């Protein structure tokens, strides 16, 4: 890959809408792992995001693009984890209604985290597949 192409890719990444909601997270050298593998290993610190996960990035970009194309006015998603929080936070930021369908077995801490982001939570079934089929 040429330096020109690489610079173009970096430029596109830096201008993406994802930074309307996500923070630029650092790369940190994993010293012990680097030493063990005799190589330089770096970890992208996505745990520093507002929902402690990279899932916010994909949810936000997808939802914003759908809104920009006037394809949605609200969103419904099935998830029991970080994706649920990413969708809820993205919807809140973008001013649309979010409904998150979660299995009844979802830990209360995850349910409460989604509710704090103003999404409506529907508990359905015992598994992700059950929630998804809702």
Predicted regions and their residues:
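PLP-dependent amino-acid enzyme catalytic core
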Residues: 1-134
